[in-house]
Design a protein with these regions (language model features):
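Residue-level signature of outer-membrane beta-barrel architecture
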Residues: 38-42, 53, 89, 97-100, ...
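Signature of Gram-negative outer-membrane beta-barrel scaffolds
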Residues: 3-105, 116-120
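Gram-negative outer-membrane beta-barrel transporters
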Residues: 44, 172-267, 290, 302-305, ...
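Transmembrane beta-strands of outer-membrane beta-barrel proteins
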Residues: 42, 47-49, 107-109, 131, ...
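Short sequence motifs at beta-strands and strand-loop junctions characteristic
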Residues: 22-31, 39, 57, 85-91, ...
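Membrane-embedded beta-barrel scaffold of Gram-negative outer-membrane proteins
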Residues: 100-103, 107-108, 123-216, 297-299
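Outer-membrane beta-barrel "beta-signal"
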Residues: 132, 318-332
Length: 332
């Protein structure tokens, strides 16, 4: 590793800085889960119901000693900085149903309670609903779904990579209150056959509306007003892949990914914006034998440099630069 100093400040790459109170920690969890699930067949209608109960214990210990990378030396004694223990339990239910309209078309519905345990805080909880249709005719497959997640307790933990203006040494969990995420999703894939060549095409598109339901202020979420957008959730995403597969063993594809704009915090300012951006990748592959292929991949063909992230904290991250990869793969 190297250090470089310019204009009185350090930049570029830094060497090992040793352990401190934030990263010299040990977290342990144990959980016991019980679940029941039953699927009922009513001909064209299938209904599945489920129940899950989970008991879990959590322990978080932190040491203030800085002894370099040898963790064994600093974790032999009692955790002098923090030692907390918690016991929790939670239950969730789910429901799912499919109805076959005909051999090509299926209706789908589902409701699932969700839970994410958090260290030293109430778990994150959400009610998740999906409604959609699936169509398949042998030459292609199409899915269209509406989805909704209603968070009663949106939770986040402060870490070095979270991008929030909080102190990672505290390992605090912040609540964003209630929030709603809903949208529409479309997935389609088709294969068009030619003379010795097939042409697979797939597209995926998602439109999302994600907002806070209440106003709050915290070091993690910042100043939030009811109706503000949730950070890092773009209004839309789209992926398009088109390629070819020949009988001679030559294949390739083009992938286009388009991501809408978003923000790194709810109160979006000039330096919190995440740009809408597009990425184009090309891939070409040739089978030499049944087991060996050679390939060439060109990523970010247009070499765009849009800002796509502002995490870890205090830094804007751009797209991966144009990258060329040449190699081979072998199947054992």
């Amino acid at each position: 590793m190297y250090k470089r100093q310019a204009d009185g400040s350090l930049s570029a790459l830094y060497g090992y800085i040793g352990l401190n109170n934030s990263n010299n920690r040990l977290r342990e969890s144990s959980a016991t889960s019980y679940y029941l699930q039953d699927t009922m067949d009513f001909g064209r209608l299938n209904v599945t119901v489920g129940y899950r109960s989970e008991d879990y214990d959590q322990r978080h210990r932190r040491w203030s000693d800085r002894a370099g990378p040898n963790l064994t030396m600093v974790r032999t004694g009692e955790a002098d900085n923090r030692d907390t223990f918690a016991t929790n339990d939670h239950t969730t239910q789910s429901f799912g149903a499919t109805y076959e309209v005909n051999e090509n078309l299926t209706l789908v519905a589902g409701f699932h309670e969700g839970m994410t345990p958090m260290f030293g805080a109430d778990p994150e909880e959400a009610d998740n609903t999906e409604l959609g249709i699936r169509y398949s005719d042998g030459a292609g497959d199409v899915e269209i779904f509406y989805f909704s997640s209603e968070y009663s307790n949106l939770a986040a933990e402060c870490t070095l990579v979270s991008g929030a203006a909080c102190n990672p040494d505290e390992s605090a969990v912040f609540s964003g209150g209630s929030a709603d995420v809903e949208g529409l999703e479309f997935n389609g894939s088709w294969v068009f056959d030619g003379d010795g060549v097939s042409y697979p095409v797939s597209i995926a598109y998602t439109s999302t509306d994600a907002t806070f339901n209440n106003s709050s202020e915290s070091d993690y979420f910042g100043v939030v007003a009811a109706g503000d957008d949730l950070p890092y959730i773009p209004s839309s995403t789209m992926s398009l892949v088109a390629g070819f597969v020949s009988d001679s063993g030559l294949s390739g594809n083009m992938r286009l990914i388009d991501v809408g704009s978003s923000c790194s915090i709810a109160a979006c300012g000039t330096y919190n914006k995440i740009h809408a951006h597009t990425i184009v990748d090309l891939n070409l592959r040739k089978a030499l034998t049944d087991a060996m292929d050679v390939y060439v991949i060109l990523e970010n063909v247009t070499d765009d440099e849009d800002i796509i992230s502002r995490a870890p904290s205090e830094g804007a991250r751009s797209q991966k630069p144009r990258t060329l990869k040449v190699g081979f793969s072998y199947k054992f």
